[in-house]
A protein has these predicted regions:
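Short histidine-centered beta-strand/loop micro-motifs
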Residues: 44-45, 72-74, 170-177, 194, ...
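Short, conserved beta-strand element in jelly-roll/cupin
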Residues: 161-164, 175-192, 231-234, 300-304, ...
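Vicinal oxygen chelate
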Residues: 15-25, 53-60, 67-104, 178-186, ...
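N-terminal beta-strand motif that seeds the catalytic metal site of vicinal oxygen chelate
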Residues: 2-30, 78-81, 109-136, 141, ...
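Short acidic-glycine-tyrosine-enriched beta hairpin
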Residues: 147, 196-214, 333-353
Length: 377
């Protein structure tokens, strides 16, 4: 029994949970779950005329009990179960969806389908922070602004994320099933911890991380006015909680690979500037190209003697820009030029002629591309 002054923990005292599956009669549905899907009987009663059975299997508990029809439907018609399988085609003779005698639908799905990458659907996308795009509340109470509406057909997601007030972040250890994911700290600071990367990191404005596939991590706390930019591929990917690994792990393994990629922490205070891919501009290289074997490149670009880029096209999968500071005008073929300010974003599809003109001396652009090397045409 807990001490009187000990706070009550939600769920304290609960031993297990089961799903109630209404069925009448019992036997056909019992046979379905035990003989076809491999559940085992844990309890059945009364012995002389069984009406209730408790089953377990595959991490799930079921309680089969009498339930009458509703509006002429079978008692379990509104219940749907999903069984995650190594190979769904080998479980029930190739069937991927089954219907139990009580009407319950059972879906057989892949336990680990991997990253599903939608086909490319490139399109020009421009967003303006001044237009007052809606901020929604996402995971762990953070506020999200979608900077790639339409998501390029589901291939890419871009989020401008903010946490207005300082303090602990109600996050938990988790990981993402992705092809590519990066976070750039635009304003404020945030403390995060990553699997096998030593003690928690303090990310400040200008810093950036590559989160390789399935690396366990957790956001710990943030300062006032935190803003980060997060880009991921594909757009629809699973974020899974990690219940076994605690962070930090006590290990520092900077060369460890996660899904073929290495973790990157870019400290802006130690960055070196070099020529960008267009003349008259320079950039600080984040280091993501080397860590992803050329899959993606991330840089911060700024003027270095020029105030515009030449009109050009590219043949890359993805070219994204987020205005970090200053102003410019985005010119795109067949579109009215648009003034771009801090927080504004663009995605330019392949083979569309474009240029950035009238760049202010303090102009800075977060430049994200897939692949790292952008073929200009």
């Amino acid at each position: 029994m807990a001490a009187p002054d000990e706070p009550h923990r939600p769920g304290a005292g609960v031993r297990s949970a089961v799903v109630v599956v209404p069925c009448d009669p019992l036997q056909p549905t019992l046979d379905f779950f035990t003989r076809r899907l491999g559940f085992r009987v844990d309890a059945i009663f009364p012995a002389d005329a069984p009406m209730i059975a408790e089953l377990s299997g595959h991490g799930l508990g079921l309680r089969l009990q009498p339930g009458g029809e509703l509006d002429g439907e079978q008692p379990g018609a509104h219940l749907r179960l999903r069984l995650r399988c190594d190979d769904p085609t080998t479980v029930a003779g190739g069937d991927r969806e089954l219907v139990a005698p009580n009407g319950t639908r059972v879906e057989l799905v892949e336990a680990d389908p991997g990253v599903v990458l939608p086909p490319e659907q490139p399109e020009l996308v421009v967003t303006h922070a001044r237009d007052g795009e809606t901020w929604g509340t996402g995971r762990a109470g953070m506020q999200y602004r979608d900077v790639i509406p339409g998501r390029q057909g589901g291939r890419f997601i871009g989020s401008h994320i903010r946490i207005p007030t300082a303090g602990p972040v109600p996050d938990y250890v988790h990981y993402h099933q992705v092809r590519f994911q990066m976070i750039y700290c635009h304003k404020g600071w945030v403390r995060v911890v990553y699997e096998d990367q030593g003690e928690p990191l303090l990310m400040e404005a200008g810093d950036c991380v590559l989160q390789p596939p399935e690396i366990r991590h957790r956001v710990l706390e943030s300062g006032d006015g935190l803003e980060v930019v997060e880009l991921g591929c594909p757009a629809d990917h699973e974020t899974r909680a990690e219940h076994e690994i605690s962070l930090p792990t006590g290990r520092l393994l900077p060369e460890r690979h996660f899904g073929g990629q290495r973790f990157v922490y870019h400290d802006a205070s130690e960055a070196e500037w070099r020529p960008w891919r267009v003349p008259g501009f320079e950039c600080r290289e984040i280091g993501i190209g080397a860590a992803t074997d050329g899959l993606a490149g991330v840089r911060v670009a700024r003027p270095a003697g020029a105030d515009h880029t030449p009109r050009t096209t590219h043949d890359a999968e993805f070219v994204f820009g987020f205005v970090l500071a200053g102003t410019c005008t985005l010119e795109c073929e067949g579109r009215v030029p648009e003034r771009m300010e801090e927080g504004d974003t663009f995605v330019v599809p392949r083979h569309l002629e474009y240029a950035l003109i009238g760049c202010s001396p303090d102009f800075e652009l977060l430049d994200v591309t897939l692949p790292e090397d952008v073929p200009l045409t």
